Amino acid sequence: KMCGVTQNWESYESTKKASQLNLTPEQQRFPQRYIKLGIFVDHGMYTKYSGNSERITKRVHQMINNINMMCRALNIVTTLSLLEIWSEKDLITVQASAPTTLTLFGAWRETVLLNRTSHDHAQLLTATIFNGNVIGRAPVGGMCDPKRSVAIVRDHNAIVFVVAVTMTHEMGHNLGNHHDEDKCNCNTCIMSKVLSRQPSKYFSECSKDYYQTFLTNHNFQCILNAPLRTDTVSTPVSGNELLEAGEDCDCGSPANPCCDAATCKLRPGAQCGEGLCCDQCRFTSAGTECRAARSECDIAESCAGQSADCPTDDFHRNGQPCLNNHGYCYNGNCPIMFYQCIALFGSNATVGQDGCFDANDIGHKYFHCRKDNEKYIPCAPQDVKCGRLFCTYIYDIDLCRYDDSANGMVAQGTKCADGKVCNSNRQCADVNTAY
């Protein structure tokens, strides 16, 4: 059984509070992110479980708990914000062709679903047996995109954990991860191309590096902020590091001095149980920095003194010059090709010569600006620096190195000319109208 993704595979430091002391070094490596999941159960899966919606709901809740456990190594909290069971009929045509079904599901999310509910990433669970022994598929790097922040997963095993690994795998693709190669020294990890008989609950070091590159090149707003308690629909689970409906605090251990583990209610005299602005069960004083600025495009946030939560992550306006006019601010980062080359090829890399980028007007699998209905659209001459990124090393004979994965494209918001940046359509557009 395998994943259907077929591409070639190639911080900020927050103030540490009592509630964060249990973070592993891996979690401290990545900034906190939150993914609100929408799960859709197709009619075939509804029929598979004899129309027992309660059984399906319980199974999905268990899947979400497993996904959340696996994503902790990336410092990601996942919550179930929407569960929809297609009990009467499918709302899209679910086919044996995984690519076709994924395309239809993405289009439905963009045109129908987002008009009626808010979430970050949607997955379709199905009983359909896909061609080629495929059990899941998702676009690489599609997180937060209206059409591409989706995945399809076959409910292929009676064991909840095994299916949850596949769901995490596909969400990993959306977060910029590719399949683990032999050099990753982990043929059973979450991003392995083929699901093993005993899949691991761990991400490989390769996956962590890919995710770190993804965060370096992108700063998608949809996963920056914690959901409200009213945004979650799963049964409250104590110790999942998130406040859900019915909880005053997320206690976890009975030894928590702020929170009663039996009731998930605050102990007498406690103002809070966790949060960046909670210290020893009390609100941190107003003005205490709770989230440092991670770049000159970001804004540091401070506690208000009346809440345990750090204010919403904010940043300077998009288009503000940064890094000595080498770039323009975009969603709190200053994306420039130089740092993207370093992220892809190491500290000795630099941007390739201008002539390298002319290859992007070919309309090839690797050299293009956009993809439309499986057709690669060449870049217009003025847009070639918004397609594939070209890098080189100092004194390197290869002046036009490139990474043929999704991460090898020039990041949105990157400066492509004076007063211009790459927009979401991979056009080199005026910085005043590009966002």
UniProtKB/Swiss-Prot annotation:
Domain of life: Eukaryota
Classification via Pfam families: ADAM_CR, Disintegrin, Reprolysin
Enzyme Commission number(s) of this protein: 3.4.24.-
Top EC category: hydrolase
SMART domains assigned to the protein according to its UniProt record, in alphabetical order: ACR (SM00608), DISIN (SM00050)
Gene Ontology MF terms: metal ion binding; metalloendopeptidase activity; toxin activity
Tissue: Expressed by the venom gland.
Assembly information from the UniProt record: Monomer.
UniProt-recorded name of the protein: Zinc metalloproteinase/disintegrin
Organism: Craspedocephalus gramineus
